[in-house]
Curated annotation (Swiss-Prot):
The modification Tyrosine amide is found at residue 64. This is Pro-neuropeptide Y. Residues 1-28 form the signal peptide. It comes from Meiacanthus atrodorsalis. GO terms for molecular function: neuropeptide hormone activity; neuropeptide Y receptor binding. InterPro entries: Pancreatic_hormone-like, Pancreatic_hormone-like_CS. The keyword Signal applies. Belongs to the NPY family. It comes from the Eukaryota. Its main location: secreted.
Length: 99
C-alpha cells in the first residue's frame, strides 16, 4: 500500500467516526416543540406551551448526584483529612542530651 492511500483512508475513517459520534450526541438531546403559529386554535397553543415548558424543564433541570453537594464534601475533607490535632502534628526528634 502507498503511504498516501493509508493517510487518506485514516482521514476518511476519522471523519466517519466523528459524524457517528455527532449523530449520537444530537439524538440524545430533546427536540424543541414546533410553534403552531399565532393563528392556531387555543387548544394547540395550550399543548405547545405545555410541551415548551416541559422542554425547558428538561434542558435546565437540576443534576442530582455527586455534583449537587460539593460544599458538604469540601467540609468533610477539610474536617477529616486536614484537621490538625496534637496527634497529627510532627514531633521533633531533637534530643539535646545526644550532643
Amino acid at each position: 500500500m502507498h503511504p498516501n492511500y493509508v493517510s487518506w483512508l485514516g482521514a476518511v475513517g476519522f471523519l466517519l467516526w466523528a459524524l457517528l459520534c455527532l449523530g449520537a450526541w444530537t439524538e440524545a438531546y430533546p427536540v424543541k416543540p414546533e410553534n403552531p403559529g399565532e393563528d392556531a386554535p387555543a387548544e394547540e397553543l395550550a399543548k405547545y406551551y405545555s410541551a415548551l415548558r416541559h422542554y425547558i424543564n428538561l434542558i435546565t433541570r437540576q443534576r442530582y448526584g455527586k455534583r449537587s453537594t460539593p460544599e458538604i464534601l469540601d467540609t468533610l475533607v477539610s474536617e477529616l483529612l486536614l484537621k490538625e490535632t496534637s496527634d497529627t502534628l510532627p514531633q521533633s526528634r531533637y534530643d539535646p542530651s545526644l550532643w
